[in-house]
């Protein structure tokens, strides 16, 4: 993870467009100015960043299902739960499943686990729209390659 770049997923482990699922790896940095202040002397990953990591994981899955034709933007998060503390250096496995896709919206169930135990989960809604600018899509494709996104899923429109 790179908090300062707002990159909260390190690597895509598996994406299955038929089942509309994804698994990603996210390693909490051992050093970050954010962790220096959350909390001083007892650094913990902020819950809002756990939620963002679940949202980014879901977003990559939606991009795969859409073949990078449309971009998901976070619209709502419901029933977000943070079940335990997440410390610097923790390796998280983030996962998501799309449970609805239609009318310009997608809904996912997402969670983060560590050593097989759920540390966070949420129901997340996205507005799914055309990319606002071609440059933005190109930047997202560049990020996708960095994360080992299976580029064969990108539609050749």
Give residue spans per PLM region:
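Short aromatic-glycine motifs in intrinsically disordered, low-complexity regions
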Residues: 1-3, 67
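Catalytic strand-loop segment that frames the active site of acyl-thioester-processing enzymes
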Residues: 4-45
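Hydrophobic core residues within well-ordered beta-strands of beta-rich domains
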Residues: 6-8, 92, 106
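A residue-level detector for short acidic-glycine micro-motifs
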Residues: 11-16, 79, 84, 98-100
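A structural signal for short, well-ordered beta-strand segments
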Residues: 12, 24-26, 77-78, 96, ...
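HotDog/MaoC-like acyl-thioester-processing domains
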Residues: 21, 88, 99-157
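Compact, glycine-rich, soluble single-domain proteins
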Residues: 39-46, 51-59, 74-75
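Hydrophobic beta-strand-centered segment that forms part of the acyl-chain substrate-binding groove
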Residues: 57-93, 119-123, 127-129
């Amino acid at each position: 993870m790179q908090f300062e770049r707002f990159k909260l997923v390190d690597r895509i482990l598996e994406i299955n467009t038929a089942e509309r699922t994804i698994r990603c790896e996210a390693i909490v940095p051992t050093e970050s100015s954010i962790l220096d202040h959350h909390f001083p002397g007892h650094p913990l990953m902020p819950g809002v960043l756990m939620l963002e990591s679940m949202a980014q994981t879901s977003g990559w899955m939606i991009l795969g299902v859409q073949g990078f034709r449309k971009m998901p933007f976070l619209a709502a998060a419901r029933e977000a739960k943070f079940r335990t503390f997440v410390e610097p250096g923790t390796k998280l496995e983030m996962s998501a499943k799309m449970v609805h896709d239609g009318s310009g919206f997608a809904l996912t169930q997402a969670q983060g686990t560590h050593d097989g135990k759920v540390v966070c989960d949420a129901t997340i809604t996205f507005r799914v729209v055309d990319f606002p600018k071609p440059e933005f899509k190109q930047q997202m494709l560049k990020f996708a390659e960095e994360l080992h996104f299976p580029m064969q899923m990108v539609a050749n429109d």
